Every structure is written in structure tokens, then in C-alpha cells.
């Protein structure tokens, strides 16, 4: 299944806020309609919607998400928490969380077009897994910096999660540590996602 490129508001109206996909928020009325239908939802649909929420927020294909679930299942610790940490430490998500891109698709475009460096080297793979002490910067070119500046000016100035530091005047971000689950920027029940995939195998 390919990455979703359809109407974004349609997705947030059904699944709730997906800040990685779009800054738009569902109207309160649509939230109430979803809640009124929640009693009719099967357990399968509840798990499916949590999985879809994760997939659309991080902009993943079905195959990519399944691969992350399998990697998380082989790691020590809670599979759900490891899954979220893996997704949060992707380069495209780190750029989004730093405020250097307004959405994860926007961050992915910056990476694909070779505007981003990690530790002084161009990285053009959005799924690159960032590590503690990684330094993320833009290419020292006017166009690259103008793009980042535009994103930073238009992004809402939210409190930065403690696993990251931003030096906006230098167009530089620093990964301080692996993200703690309490700093995840998405309202999600990761256990339901793991359950969804465990029942598919």
C-alpha cells in the first residue's frame, strides 16, 4: 500500500488530530459525531483506526509500518514503546519536531531534495534513524536556509521536547537523547497497534 496523498482533512475528521500530516484540526462537531459512533465500533475497527492514525501521522506505507513493528518486537522492552521511539527518531520526524518543517511530508521533501545534513554530511533518506548527539543542519546555501526559515516562521512556537535542542539562528538542531514516551506529539494507544498486527499473523 502506497503512502497516503489524498485529502488530509478527511483523515483528521475520522481519526482526530494528526499534526504530522497537517496543522489543521477537526471541528469540534466532527469530534462529537465520531464519539457518538464509537459505541458501534468493533474491537477490530478500534485497533485498525489506531494503526491508521500512526501510519498517517508519520507518513508511512503499510509495508514500512509493518517492518517497524517487527523490528520493535525483536527489541528489549515494550514493543509499543520501542515502536514509537523508532518512528520518533526518524530524520523527517526530527525535523518536524524541531520546527524546521511544518509537517512530516514537508520534512521528507527537504531531505529528498538534499537540503539537510547530519553531522556535516548530506542525508537524503527520510527514514534515517537519528541517534543521541546527532547534529542536524541545513546546507550552507541561500535557498536551503530560506526554505527552513520560512518553515520556522510559519510553524507554531510550541515547547520543544526535551530530547531535542534547536539553535534557530544557526539553522541547527541537536538530538540530546532517545525520546521518552511522554514527549510523543501524538495521542495514540500504541498497544492497540501492536495488537492489530499480532492478530494479522
From Swiss-Prot:
<comment type="function">
    <text>One of the primary rRNA binding proteins, it binds directly to 16S rRNA where it nucleates assembly of the body of the 30S subunit.</text>
</comment>
<dbReference type="GO" id="GO:0009507">
    <property type="term" value="C:chloroplast"/>
</dbReference>
<dbReference type="InterPro" id="IPR001912">
    <property type="entry name" value="Ribosomal_uS4_N"/>
</dbReference>
<dbReference type="GO" id="GO:0006412">
    <property type="term" value="P:translation"/>
</dbReference>
<keyword id="KW-0689">Ribosomal protein</keyword>
<dbReference type="InterPro" id="IPR005709">
    <property type="entry name" value="Ribosomal_uS4_bac-type"/>
</dbReference>
<dbReference type="GO" id="GO:0015935">
    <property type="term" value="C:small ribosomal subunit"/>
</dbReference>
<dbReference type="GO" id="GO:0019843">
    <property type="term" value="F:rRNA binding"/>
</dbReference>
<dbReference type="InterPro" id="IPR036986">
    <property type="entry name" value="S4_RNA-bd_sf"/>
</dbReference>
<dbReference type="InterPro" id="IPR002942">
    <property type="entry name" value="S4_RNA-bd"/>
</dbReference>
<dbReference type="GO" id="GO:0003735">
    <property type="term" value="F:structural constituent of ribosome"/>
</dbReference>
<dbReference type="Pfam" id="PF00163">
    <property type="entry name" value="Ribosomal_S4"/>
</dbReference>
<dbReference type="InterPro" id="IPR018079">
    <property type="entry name" value="Ribosomal_uS4_CS"/>
</dbReference>
<dbReference type="InterPro" id="IPR022801">
    <property type="entry name" value="Ribosomal_uS4"/>
</dbReference>
<protein>
    <recommendedName>
        <fullName>Small ribosomal subunit protein uS4c</fullName>
    </recommendedName>
</protein>
<keyword id="KW-0699">rRNA-binding</keyword>
<comment type="similarity">
    <text>Belongs to the universal ribosomal protein uS4 family.</text>
</comment>
<comment type="subunit">
    <text>Part of the 30S ribosomal subunit. Contacts protein S5. The interaction surface between S4 and S5 is involved in control of translational fidelity.</text>
</comment>
<keyword id="KW-0934">Plastid</keyword>
<feature type="region of interest" description="Disordered">
    <location>
        <begin position="15"/>
        <end position="43"/>
    </location>
</feature>
<keyword id="KW-0694">RNA-binding</keyword>
<feature type="domain" description="S4 RNA-binding">
    <location>
        <begin position="89"/>
        <end position="150"/>
    </location>
</feature>
<keyword id="KW-0150">Chloroplast</keyword>
<comment type="function">
    <text>With S5 and S12 plays an important role in translational accuracy.</text>
</comment>
<dbReference type="GO" id="GO:0042274">
    <property type="term" value="P:ribosomal small subunit biogenesis"/>
</dbReference>
<dbReference type="Pfam" id="PF01479">
    <property type="entry name" value="S4"/>
</dbReference>
<keyword id="KW-0687">Ribonucleoprotein</keyword>
